[in-house]
């Protein structure tokens, strides 16, 4: 084959090949393909990082672990709540109609006798052995101070089954007025609250009483000011 024939064949082959796309349309197509490839690579990289550093994926396992840890705690709280409901408790208030004496009453609003505690002979009867919080409050008041000092006492006593004598558990004395005050002070109304509270080991059938020395000075102007109660711990 001559040289001219070979050159001619090459020229014919070049003419038969498709021409490359040119112009603005081809450039936009290439740009879109490049942008899509970049977004695909960026998304795959982000997903890999999230999985690698535990941002997503293990949350379900962590949630299950948290629920497993909370389950014993919830059971403990439920058991504690149930145990609290089963413990002896009492809260009684003074009867304002009982003139000249401190008479405890269980029939009024916000009073409570639960899980074996009884109110007998103006005393709270303990149903079981154990530690108890014992508390009481009284409120004294007067329109004016008398010419002689007034000493107000409030006492919580225990009559135990293990020994016959009555023993004081808590006691307090207050004097709201001082003798020899001026006429202005004597004419001024006064108020004196006394609160007692403490934790004691008690026995079944122990009897507790809360007493005062001057019931005529008790203030019943508002409900809930004079009360007596126990709570098993």
UniProtKB/Swiss-Prot annotation:
The chain crosses the membrane at residues 35-57. Residues 88-233 form the THD domain. Coiled coil: none annotated. The keyword Transmembrane applies. GO terms for biological process: extrinsic apoptotic signaling pathway via death domain receptors; immune response; necroptotic signaling pathway; negative regulation of protein-containing complex disassembly; positive regulation of apoptotic process; positive regulation of canonical NF-kappaB signal transduction; positive regulation of extrinsic apoptotic signaling pathway; positive regulation of JUN kinase activity. Homotrimer. Interacts with SPPL2B. Belongs to the tumor necrosis factor family. Cytokine that binds to TNFRSF1A/TNFR1 and TNFRSF1B/TNFBR. It is mainly secreted by macrophages and can induce cell death of certain tumor cell lines. It is potent pyrogen causing fever by direct action or by stimulation of interleukin-1 secretion and is implicated in the induction of cachexia, Under certain conditions it can stimulate cell proliferation and induce cell differentiation. Induces insulin resistance in adipocytes via inhibition of insulin-induced IRS1 tyrosine phosphorylation and insulin-induced glucose uptake. The TNF intracellular domain (ICD) form induces IL12 production in dendritic cells. This is Tumor necrosis factor. It comes from Camelus bactrianus.
């Amino acid at each position: 084959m001559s040289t001219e024939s070979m050159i001619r064949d090459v020229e014919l082959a070049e003419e038969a090949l498709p021409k490359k796309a040119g112009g603005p349309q081809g450039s936009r197509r290439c740009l879109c393909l490049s942008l899509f490839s970049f977004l695909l690579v960026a998304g795959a990289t982000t997903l890999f990082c999230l999985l690698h550093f535990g941002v997503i994926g293990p949350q379900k396992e962590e949630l299950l672990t948290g629920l497993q840890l909370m389950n014993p705690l919830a059971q403990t709280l439920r058991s504690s709540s149930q145990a609290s409901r089963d413990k002896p408790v009492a809260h009684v208030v003074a009867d304002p109609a009982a003139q000249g004496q401190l008479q405890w009453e269980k029939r009024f609003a916000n009073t409570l006798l639960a899980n074996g505690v009884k109110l007998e002979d103006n005393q709270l009867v303990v149903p079981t052995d154990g530690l108890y919080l014992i508390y009481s409050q009284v409120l004294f008041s007067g329109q004016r101070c008398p010419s002689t000092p007034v000493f107000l006492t409030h006492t919580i006593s225990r009559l135990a089954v293990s020994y016959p004598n009555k023993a004081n558990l808590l006691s307090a004395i207050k004097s709201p007025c001082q003798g020899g005050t001026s006429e202005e002070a004597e004419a001024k109304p006064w108020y004196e609250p006394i609160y007692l509270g403490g934790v004691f080991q008690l026995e079944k059938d122990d009897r507790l009483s809360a007493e005062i020395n001057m019931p005529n000075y008790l203030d019943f102007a508002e409900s809930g000011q004079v009360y007596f109660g126990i709570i098993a711990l």
